[in-house]
Amino acid sequence: MVYDSDVDVLRAFMGSGITVIVHTTNALLPMLASDISVATAWINTNIAPFAATISHISVGNEVLGTNNQSQYSMFLNSAIHNVYNALVSVNLHESILVSTTHAAAVLDPSSFPPSLGHFSSDIVPNIMPILNFLSSTGAPFMVNVYPFIAYIASSQNIELPYALGSGNVQISDFNSGLIYTSLFDAQVDTFISAIEKLGFGNISLIVTETGWPSYGHPSATLANAQAYNAYILEHVASSRGTPKRPSTPIQTQIFALFNENQK
């Protein structure tokens, strides 16, 4: 995951065999939405020269459902279409897929268990055209999944080994009968349920961020971060998928490569 289109970073990945997801900044959304020539210029400068190493573009990050980014929500759908059409103009729309990244805030707070996952009612008008776009282009729904955040918000109800994916805890979804052994799987399947409830069961899902902090909270320790990251690496490598979508690999990025201790 490359936040913003830093050409020096993208150049460094050229020839490495590693493909990356490039984000546009949220602040750029109004310009991308208002004029396709802006999107075309951005693609020609920041994407086309490095196309061999870019797999996806995320137009914005956590724009919907987060109060501090709500000023950009009205521009999101148009920006996505203009970026896609700019890729079409240089014949890169089949090799580079366009989507946008969502936080758990787009889900209704009552989305438990996973089979009852659904989007907040105020989000649906904004997310429906995005789902239509993803369905028609074959692009994935992108989500940031953080069991740590859910755990510290409800530690009295969530066991730490379940949040870390490192124990023998089993939680049954009373509605579907599926058994969950990790909060990560439960959160991913909650998003999938929400997508399916709107009629888009054909859309795949990518986890664009997940991780566990190592400082700043009693449960944010090096040992816990190591345990969680080891679990994620094993889970992704196994391609076992989730209870709702077994044997379906989950493309996942660990956040972050470096310590953001000043964030």
Description of each model-found segment:
Residues M1-S5:
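Catalytic beta/alpha-barrel core
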Residues V7-M14, I43-P49, V88-S89, M128-S136, ...:
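Short amphipathic alpha-helices and their capping/turn segments at secondary-structure boundaries
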Residues H81-N85, E94, S99, S121-K263:
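Substrate-binding and catalytic surfaces of secreted/luminal carbohydrate-active proteins
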Residues L10-D108, F112-D122, V207:
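Substrate-binding cleft of extracellular glycoside hydrolase catalytic domains
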